[in-house]
């Protein structure tokens, strides 16, 4: 992440290079045929451990809540820890066996992959799209947050009810929706639309998610530049989250929270599909394993719960490393998901609604290190105003504006 964030205070390289792979040829196989072709051996894994260990990670969680969130640096932050270990026989057969098990266990993953980077390998089943754009310019983002760790027998109605009525889990999801609305408000030609919420059920976890859709005329490079990185793996506001990560991260993030993307060139345009690199195992040339996971920390977080959430997120990879694959379970809780939508602003969920009246004139929004300004801009444009956003406006600019809006930013509102 640090290589992409050169302009942020978090410039801290971890030795993980940006990699572009030119596809010379491709072959498409059905999931069923691929599963038949892949090997299935039990990998020899040893020295499994968490870095940092539970107690140390819990102390870190408390420091971030008490000092960074309470101190006004931001509303939520994601700090990773890693499951570490050693692959006894680091062979392609072992790697493909892990990939096969993830493919079997996690049919709901957005993208499942084995990717040879030259010096290391990434194997993962990511639940989360980063951004997708088709050749016509239709664009989608997929904020996911909130985690229900299933019981050993699978998800239950009682467990789903407790999860979907938990205010902390609801607030976590709404925070990341706001952050990705900021991104799409910056990228899209017109206001983006919210679809959802939905339950994203994985083999051993359930998350909640929304889809945000819109249309853009931006090129791929600008879409990636303006959308990196997802708040679900970093926090918000994004600038503050970079700073907190630089201060608090115990181990290098490497590819955690980056993206694995595919760009295709068509006669009528360029398309992009990408997944966030979470739930991803990195294996280096010596067979060292690294599986980073994180928890979203908010003011109401409890250290013990966040520690448990991170260990819960390693259950699938532990099963892929040590157990035969198992199937998933049916979803529950659709009515409770629908109730969550009641708290969302209709501007983002019902784009067909016309404003009760239109305005004219010029609005100037002062940007104070929080991209909520771009959401405000889309709302004011919808009302008929001509809007400009500036982080350092001249006094004359403010004088000429019919409406001056001071955008939000980091800090403690009680100061």
Regions found by a protein language model. Give the residues of each.
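RNA-binding accessory domains that recognize and position tRNA/RNA substrates
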Residues: 330-368
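Short hydrophobic beta-strand that contains or immediately precedes a catalytic carboxylate
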Residues: 79, 175-177, 365
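Conserved hydrophobic core element of enzyme catalytic domains
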Residues: 213-334
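Flexible gly/pro-rich beta->alpha loop and the following alpha-helix that scaffold active-site loops
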Residues: 362-363, 370-415
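Non-catalytic accessory segments adjacent to catalytic cores
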Residues: 1-89, 93, 189, 195-198, ...
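An anion-binding catalytic pocket shared by soluble metabolic enzymes
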Residues: 78-171, 186, 263-293
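Hydrophobic multi-pass inner-membrane translocation pores used for secretion
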Residues: 250, 324, 360-365, 369-372
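Contiguous alpha-helical scaffold segments within structured protein domains
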Residues: 25-48, 86, 148-151, 155-246, ...
């Amino acid at each position: 992440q640090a290589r992409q964030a050169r302009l942020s205070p978090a410039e801290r390289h971890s030795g993980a290079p940006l990699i572009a792979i030119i596809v010379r040829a491709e072959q498409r196989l059905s999931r069923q045929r691929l599963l038949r072709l892949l090997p299935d051996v039990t990998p020899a894994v040893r020295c499994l451990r968490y870095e940092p260990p539970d107690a140390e990670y819990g102390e870190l969680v408390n420091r971030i809540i008490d000092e960074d969130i309470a101190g006004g640096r931001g509303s939520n932050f994601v700090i990773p820890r890693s499951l570490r270990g050693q692959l006894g026989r680091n062979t392609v057969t072992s790697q493909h066996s892990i990939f096969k098990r993830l493919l079997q266990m996690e049919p709901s993953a957005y993208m499942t992959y084995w990717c040879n980077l030259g010096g290391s390998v990434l194997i993962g089943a990511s639940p989360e799209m980063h951004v997708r754009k088709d050749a016509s310019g239709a664009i989608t983002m997929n904020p996911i947050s909130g985690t229900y760790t299933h019981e050993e027998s699978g998800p239950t109605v009682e467990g789903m009810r407790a999860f979907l009525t938990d205010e902390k889990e609801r607030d976590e999801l709404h925070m990341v929706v706001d952050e990705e609305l900021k991104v799409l408000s910056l990228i899209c030609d017109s206001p983006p639309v919210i679809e959802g919420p939905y339950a994203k059920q994985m083999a051993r976890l359930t998350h909640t998610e929304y889809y945000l859709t819109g249309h853009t005329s931006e090129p791929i490079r600008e879409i990636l530049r303006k959308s990196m990185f997802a708040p679900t793996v970093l926090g918000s506001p994004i600038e503050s989250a970079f700073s907190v990560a630089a201060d608090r991260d115990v181990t290098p993030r490497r590819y955690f929270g980056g993206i694995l993307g595919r760009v295709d060139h068509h006669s009528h345009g360029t398309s992009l599909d990408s997944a966030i690199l979470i739930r991803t195992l990195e294996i280096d040339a010596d067979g060292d394993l690294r599986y980073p996971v994180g928890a979203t920390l908010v003011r109401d977080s409890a250290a013990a719960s966040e520690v448990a959430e991170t260990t819960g997120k390693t259950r699938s990879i532990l099963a892929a490393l040590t157990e035969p694959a198992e199937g998933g379970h049916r979803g529950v809780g659709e009515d409770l998901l629908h109730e969550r939508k009641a708290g969302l602003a209709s501007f983002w969920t019902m784009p067909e609604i016309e404003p009760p009246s239109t305005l004219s004139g010029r609005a100037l929004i002062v940007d104070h290190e929080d991209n909520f300004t771009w959401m405000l801009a889309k709302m004011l444009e919808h009302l008929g105003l001509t809007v400009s956003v500036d982080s350092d406006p001249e006094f004359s600019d403010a004088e000429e504006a019919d409406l001056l809006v001071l955008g939000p930013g980091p800090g403690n509102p009680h100061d």
